[in-house]
């Protein structure tokens, strides 16, 4: 009788322990699920766009040309940029060999960017992406051909480790006349259509960045729903769940990204997909004045836009 009581007591105790552990497991699991988005220790990835104006300058009096690759490399390292989209850069065999010269200059100052993608432009103003992270795929899309725009778009897929980043860079047609505006609107609509078709429903959960010189110099470019910027932000419909966001328009108080002797304008943008926009704030975007050269002039009339991608704020590193 006593043995039976002892056996029943042990069984009861075992049962209570099992139930307790089960409850504890259920209570802990949601907590882990809530905290899995926070991954401390992951470094911020700095992604930039910059129109470098051929990586050269000419003395208008003497017509002497100055190559600026070493200065541009120093500016990239100083800003600690990991991935950069370039406009007005020349592919080897064209007007220059900017990509190779830049990579050499970066290597010489211990800031190697060995991964590169590029797209040729009929106007000799080529596009390129340099990266410290592997570029797994790249392609030229929206080639001008019979289209009204003068330059293509460069698309690249970059492996950030546990996440893929899709980066698009472009250099839209300049000037405020109606023909130039129409070309920008047409290319913006074509790029938005390409992105919608390529990503489908996954567009809301994918890291996508549009970074470049979109030459949004006209007030119409900024028009709600129908302007160049809102077309690129996919805001031309009633569905707000797939809206992209121009970080510099949102957080930099309309600071100009281009400045010449005659005027200043917001021509350059970093526009991010819903996944990245949801985690962005005023610290996610910055504008950097290009430093002067030893000759006293600036490296470019365009400023550098930089997006601080903080992986620890995304639910993708698990």
Predicted regions and their residues:
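N-terminal, active-site-proximal structural segment of metallo-dependent hydrolase catalytic domains
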Residues: 16, 31-108, 119-126, 188-189, ...
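Structured beta-strand-rich core segments of catalytic domains in phosphoester-bond hydrolases
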Residues: 90-172
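Extracytoplasmic, non-cytosolic globular domains
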Residues: 63-75, 84, 152-244
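Bacterial N-terminal signal peptides
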Residues: 17-27
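Solvent-exposed loop/turn segments at secondary-structure junctions
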Residues: 52-56, 89-93, 121-125, 134-136, ...
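Metal-dependent phosphoester-hydrolase catalytic domains
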Residues: 34, 148, 197-209, 216-318
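Bacterial N-terminal signal peptides that target proteins for export
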Residues: 4-17
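Structural recognition of the beta-strand scaffold that forms the well-ordered cores
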Residues: 46-49, 82-88, 117-118, 127-129, ...
């Amino acid at each position: 009788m006593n043995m039976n009581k002892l056996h029943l007591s042990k069984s009861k105790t075992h049962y209570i322990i099992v139930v307790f552990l089960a409850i504890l497991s259920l209570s802990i699991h949601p907590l882990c699920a809530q905290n899995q988005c926070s991954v401390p220790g992951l470094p911020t990835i700095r992604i930039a766009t910059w129109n470098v104006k051929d990586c050269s300058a000419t003395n208008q009096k003497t017509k002497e040309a100055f190559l600026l690759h070493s200065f541009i490399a120093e500016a990239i390292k100083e800003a600690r940029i990991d991935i950069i989209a370039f406009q007005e850069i020349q592919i080897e065999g064209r007007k220059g060999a900017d990509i190779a010269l830049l990579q050499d200059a970066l290597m010489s100052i211990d800031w190697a960017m060995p991964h590169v993608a590029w797209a040729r432009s009929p106007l000799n103003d080529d596009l390129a992406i340099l990266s410290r992270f592997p570029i797994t795929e790249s392609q030229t899309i929206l080639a001008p051909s019979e289209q009204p725009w003068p330059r293509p778009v460069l698309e690249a897929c970059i492996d950030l480790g546990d996440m893929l980043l899709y980066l698009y860079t472009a250099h839209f047609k300049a000037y405020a006349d109606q023909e130039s505006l129409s070309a920008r609107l047409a290319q913006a609509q074509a790029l938005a259509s390409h992105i919608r078709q390529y990503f489908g429903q996954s567009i809301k959960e994918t890291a996508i960045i549009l970074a470049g010189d979109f030459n949004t110099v006209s007030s119409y470019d900024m028009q709600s729903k129908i302007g160049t910027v809102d077309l690129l932000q996919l805001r031309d419909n009633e569905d707000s769940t797939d809206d992209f966001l121009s970080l510099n328009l949102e957080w930099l108080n309309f600071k100009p990204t281009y400045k010449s002797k005659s005027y200043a304008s917001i021509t350059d943008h970093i526009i991010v997909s819903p996944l990245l926009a949801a985690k962005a704030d005023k610290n996610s975007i910055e504008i950097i004045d290009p430093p002067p050269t030893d000759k006293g002039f600036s490296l470019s009339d365009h400023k550098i836009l930089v997006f601080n991608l903080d992986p620890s704020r995304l639910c993708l590193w698990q």
